[in-house]
């Protein structure tokens, strides 16, 4: 056990060659925000790439309860090492030219508990994309391949959390994604079109028998939006958008689910230190095979603000609807709220705080069926960093972090809890 701990602890030393580019309002939301239910702009966006090669390594120590969703009957201590390697190139998003990206992200797990071992101890992510920018037109193409093993996975690479963590605790899956987007600047407005195709291969692990059951999920989505700059609102873009598509699980006899989601959208880019973007609309879902139909309001708000004291605040609020990956007959309406704060102190010390809350309402799509369950997922993360003065590096930092994650369900079967400790070294050229 000590040998495994020592080997994986070596991953805690790493470096990151990157700049500290600020997102603006136009980059906070895009067509990917609406065609991808698991989209994270900090990982998927090509818009803020510059010439750089990056490498980052993090080691986490996890204490998990309810590994197998058996009402906290199984607990385990886990070491998790993450690595991200990539090459990115291209100019500024406002300049004509070509941006490109190729990234590998890996998660590696080792159990320190004799009663628990991983059948699939690693996650692998291969992300690639190009963006071609002309004087008035942008064309982007992204292709991703992701593979996750089951049982107690760690957080995503970009630090986000969602209900998919809870749902995938005993699910292993592969995901192939292809995304195409075109953006055209008109005289006083911008037209944006995005198309995505997702193919999932799930491996559901039966809790009591231990055998695996395979099933697929296919999703096609398109998003069309139009933004204009009103003369009466400075630094603001207002727009209309509509997302449409179809999701299908061939093993589900209820058939494919169609969706149509129109929305009002807005972007406010006050300064490099302040930007917000949001939307409000509704999500209409139906099936051709029966009389199922439901309408749910959806909304979102993303933004950041830097106070005069240099305190950096960020917020992310989202409500969305999507089919459950665990309960095949259910749709999940989730309300997510995330707020973060960063404060720099003297002597290069910084403190980062983040709180995340998600309420998930599982509703059966079968006629006459009652609500399946509701869940409250909460996460609190704190990180303490210290800037280091090292020659040849523009910026360098060592930090430690702690994250507490807990899920409370109306069915105790789905309750779980996690404590996560980590160490990270970061260097920038």
Name what the model sees in each region.
Residues 1-7:
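Bacterial N-terminal signal peptides that target proteins for export
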Residues 7-9, 297:
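Alpha-helical protein-protein interaction elements
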Residues 9-15:
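Bacterial N-terminal signal peptides
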Residues 15-22:
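C-terminal segment of classical bacterial N-terminal signal peptides
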Residues 24-429:
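Gram-negative and organellar
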């Amino acid at each position: 056990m000590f040998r495994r701990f020592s080997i994986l602890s070596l991953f805690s030393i790493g470096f990151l060659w990157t700049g500290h580019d600020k997102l603006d309002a136009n980059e906070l939301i895009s067509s990917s925000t609406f065609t991808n239910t698991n989209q994270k702009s900090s990982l998927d966006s090509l818009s803020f790439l510059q010439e750089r090669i990056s490498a980052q390594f993090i080691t986490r120590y996890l204490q998990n309860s309810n590994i197998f969703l058996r009402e906290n009957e199984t607990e385990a201590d886990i070491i998790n090492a993450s690595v991200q390697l990539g090459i990115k190139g291209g100019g500024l998003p406002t300049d004509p030219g070509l941006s490109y990206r190729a990234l590998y992200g890996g998660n590696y797990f080792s159990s320190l508990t004799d009663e628990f071992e991983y059948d699939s101890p690693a996650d692998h992510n291969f992300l690639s994309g190009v963006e071609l920018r002309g004087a008035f037109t942008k064309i982007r193409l992204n292709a991703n391949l992701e593979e996750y093993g089951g049982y107690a996975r760690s957080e995503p690479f970009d630090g986000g959390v969602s209900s998919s963590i809870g749902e995938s605790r005993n699910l292993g899956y592969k995901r192939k994604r292809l995304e195409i987007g075109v953006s055209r600047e008109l005289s006083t407005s911008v037209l944006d079109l995005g198309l995505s195709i997702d193919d999932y291969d799930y491996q559901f692990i039966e809790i009591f028998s231990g055998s695996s059951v395979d099933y697929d999920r296919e999703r096609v989505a398109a998003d069309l939006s139009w933004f204009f700059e009103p003369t009466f609102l400075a630094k603001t873009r207002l727009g209309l958008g509509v997302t449409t598509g179809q999701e299908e699980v061939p093993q589900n006899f209820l058939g494919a689910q169609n969706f149509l989601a129109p929305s009002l959208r807005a972007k406010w880019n006050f300064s490099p230190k302040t930007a917000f973007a949001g939307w409000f609309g509704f999500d209409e879902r139906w099936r051709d095979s029966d009389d199922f139909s439901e309408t749910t309001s959806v909304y979102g708000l993303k933004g950041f603000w830097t106070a005069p004291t240099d305190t950096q605040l960020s917020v992310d609020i989202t409500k969305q609807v999507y089919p459950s990956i665990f309960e095949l007959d259910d749709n999940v309406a989730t309300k997510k709220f995330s707020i973060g704060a960063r404060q720099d102190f003297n002597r290069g010390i910084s403190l980062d705080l983040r709180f995340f809350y998600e309420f998930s309402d599982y509703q059966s799509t079968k006629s006459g069926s009652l609500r399946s369950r509701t869940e409250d997922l909460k996460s609190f993360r704190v990180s303490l960093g210290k800037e280091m003065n090292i020659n040849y590096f523009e910026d360098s930092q060592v930090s430690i972090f702690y994250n507490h994650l807990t899920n409370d369900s109306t069915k105790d079967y789905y309750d779980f809890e996690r404590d996560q400790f980590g160490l990270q070294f970061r260097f920038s050229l």
